[in-house]
Structures are given as structure tokens and as C-alpha cells.
């Protein structure tokens, strides 16, 4: 007897491909869906090979396969957001925006239109029930854990979402793929932003919004002009390489001012801070933070969680006070909270205090 219909987001990669197999083995009726998200004007359909890989996997596993076009929503909510943030002197995380508005909103809604009871992805996270609520828990594979990107999920989404890969090590996923004869078993993991395959975000923005990129001044902490920069989009907090200025000592970007179009330069010690304000906060084990909590938090995907106090503020904001100084806290990135293995929530870094 079927456990229900699952709409699986297929990317053509090994994780979503093996997820299809696992779900089918567990008794679900799987529908494979590939999202056509964007087209590179220089190359045409940028991900044709990925779509074909996904289609071949679906044929191999004998599951229905569909391609849906979400280009406009992806452009409006991810690409335009990405560009606007850089032009505003912030460093965005497009994967967080994509999960919030595309994978777990647009795709979630598409799954319902296909008559699915659940949606599934190839993300490395676990979904469990604790104290009567669905929560997100770190994956079995610490190196592949993707909970940092998932803090925006709501209860209604978690109740209908399955992430099979969270229960496996990556090597095991590849092993399953090879054993069942999937050609994608040795396909490389994507490391770059999907719509910037050459990893040159500055070049991407320049091609699309060249007129908005303005040269400006490098200034020191006292406001003294010490050089010229080529546009604030090319810089991020903590950056040392590629500044093109010689001060006779290591120089770091410590702030970016979009109003004056200035990039502030300082010493390495200046990029270590302990406090921040985050906006657009979402919590998963509970609806609202009523009082301060002692948790662990991290300010970038690759960082280790560090002890911090999370203090509720008005307008869906929190203040985060770390026990130890954090390197290069960056506006536009996400700060994410954990209680041991459980993802508690997160928000967008708005201000460094």
C-alpha cells in the first residue's frame, strides 16, 4: 500500500537522484520535478545537461518526470535580491533566499498542484518531531549538513517535507547510486552559486547592472581617503586580497557605506566583534522568542557554532551577543541558532553592534 504521493525536487545530482530511489523503496509514489530557474543570455538554457541527467534518472527508476518553469519568481526573489544586496553594501546568501521563496514556497505549491501529499529534496537535514512540533536536526554527515540554510521553514512546510539524505553519509549516498546503476553516482557536488557558474559575482552584476557600479574611495577609520575602489559590490567584510592598496601592513575591509560609496579599511583586530542585530527572524521549535535564550550561533555556513545569548527585540528582530569574538560578521549574511543538534532558527544580519 502506498504511503502517499511525493513530489521530489530533482536537480540531476546524486543526492536528489538517490532520494528518489530511497522514497520509492519506502513505499511512496514518487513524482520527479525539475525546476527551470534561469537562463544565461550568453549561453541559452544554462542547465540543459542537469535537466537531462534528472530525466534519465527518472526513466531508470520508472517514475513520472516533469519540468516546471519558475524563472520569473527566481529572478524576482533570488537574482534581483542578490544584486540589490550587493549594491547596498551587503553580502547576501542566495541559497537562503532560494530555500525560502523557491524550494519551500514555489515548489511546495507546485507539489500540491501535482496532487502530492508531500514534497522532498536532496538536502542533508533531518526532520523530527519534538514536543509536539516538527523540528530540523543536523544531518548524519556533519561535513554535508545543510541546516544553516533551512531556518526559514514553517510548521506547515515541515509537516509535508521529507529529506531522505539527512540520514546518510555522503559516501553511502554515492555507493547506493553506483549499486543501482545511476550514471550520476560520481557527479561532482556544485560549489558555486547556481546562476553564477564561474563564481564571479562581480562580473555577473557588471554584465546586468553596469551603470549602477560606481568607483569610490577607500577610507581609514578616521575617514581619511587612502585610495580608490572599483565599486562596493567587489568587497565584503574581512576581505584582504584584491584590494589594490599598499599601506605597508595588512589591510582589511571593516565596513562598507553604500550612502557615501566608501569602503572602510582597518586592521585585522577590527573585524572581530561580539554583537549583532538580526532581522526577519524565524524560530522553528516555537513561534516567538519571549525571553533571552542561551544557545549556540554561527554567522556563516562554514563556521562552527559558538555560545551566544539571543535577546528578543521588537519588529521581529533579535540581538545576538557572542561569548567569544567572531571573525568578519557580515551584513546580509544569516546568523543561525542551535540547541545542540537542533536548529532553533535564524535571521539576516542587519547591524554589527
Swiss-Prot record:
<dbReference type="Pfam" id="PF20259">
    <property type="entry name" value="tRNA_Me_trans_M"/>
</dbReference>
<feature type="binding site">
    <location>
        <begin position="9"/>
        <end position="16"/>
    </location>
    <ligand>
        <name>ATP</name>
    </ligand>
</feature>
<dbReference type="InterPro" id="IPR046884">
    <property type="entry name" value="MnmA-like_central"/>
</dbReference>
<feature type="region of interest" description="Interaction with tRNA">
    <location>
        <begin position="300"/>
        <end position="301"/>
    </location>
</feature>
<feature type="binding site">
    <location>
        <position position="35"/>
    </location>
    <ligand>
        <name>ATP</name>
    </ligand>
</feature>
<keyword id="KW-0808">Transferase</keyword>
<dbReference type="GO" id="GO:0002143">
    <property type="term" value="P:tRNA wobble position uridine thiolation"/>
</dbReference>
<keyword id="KW-0819">tRNA processing</keyword>
<dbReference type="Pfam" id="PF03054">
    <property type="entry name" value="tRNA_Me_trans"/>
</dbReference>
<protein>
    <recommendedName>
        <fullName>tRNA-specific 2-thiouridylase MnmA 2</fullName>
        <ecNumber>2.8.1.13</ecNumber>
    </recommendedName>
</protein>
<feature type="active site" description="Nucleophile">
    <location>
        <position position="98"/>
    </location>
</feature>
<dbReference type="InterPro" id="IPR023382">
    <property type="entry name" value="MnmA-like_central_sf"/>
</dbReference>
<dbReference type="InterPro" id="IPR014729">
    <property type="entry name" value="Rossmann-like_a/b/a_fold"/>
</dbReference>
<keyword id="KW-0963">Cytoplasm</keyword>
<dbReference type="Pfam" id="PF20258">
    <property type="entry name" value="tRNA_Me_trans_C"/>
</dbReference>
<feature type="binding site">
    <location>
        <position position="122"/>
    </location>
    <ligand>
        <name>ATP</name>
    </ligand>
</feature>
<feature type="disulfide bond" description="Alternate">
    <location>
        <begin position="98"/>
        <end position="194"/>
    </location>
</feature>
<keyword id="KW-1015">Disulfide bond</keyword>
<feature type="region of interest" description="Interaction with tRNA">
    <location>
        <begin position="144"/>
        <end position="146"/>
    </location>
</feature>
<dbReference type="GO" id="GO:0005524">
    <property type="term" value="F:ATP binding"/>
</dbReference>
<feature type="active site" description="Cysteine persulfide intermediate">
    <location>
        <position position="194"/>
    </location>
</feature>
<dbReference type="GO" id="GO:0103016">
    <property type="term" value="F:tRNA-uridine 2-sulfurtransferase activity"/>
</dbReference>
<keyword id="KW-0547">Nucleotide-binding</keyword>
<dbReference type="GO" id="GO:0005737">
    <property type="term" value="C:cytoplasm"/>
</dbReference>
<keyword id="KW-0820">tRNA-binding</keyword>
<dbReference type="InterPro" id="IPR046885">
    <property type="entry name" value="MnmA-like_C"/>
</dbReference>
<feature type="site" description="Interaction with tRNA">
    <location>
        <position position="123"/>
    </location>
</feature>
<dbReference type="GO" id="GO:0000049">
    <property type="term" value="F:tRNA binding"/>
</dbReference>
<comment type="similarity">
    <text>Belongs to the MnmA/TRMU family.</text>
</comment>
<feature type="site" description="Interaction with tRNA">
    <location>
        <position position="333"/>
    </location>
</feature>
<dbReference type="InterPro" id="IPR004506">
    <property type="entry name" value="MnmA-like"/>
</dbReference>
<keyword id="KW-0694">RNA-binding</keyword>
<keyword id="KW-0067">ATP-binding</keyword>
<comment type="function">
    <text>Catalyzes the 2-thiolation of uridine at the wobble position (U34) of tRNA, leading to the formation of s(2)U34.</text>
</comment>
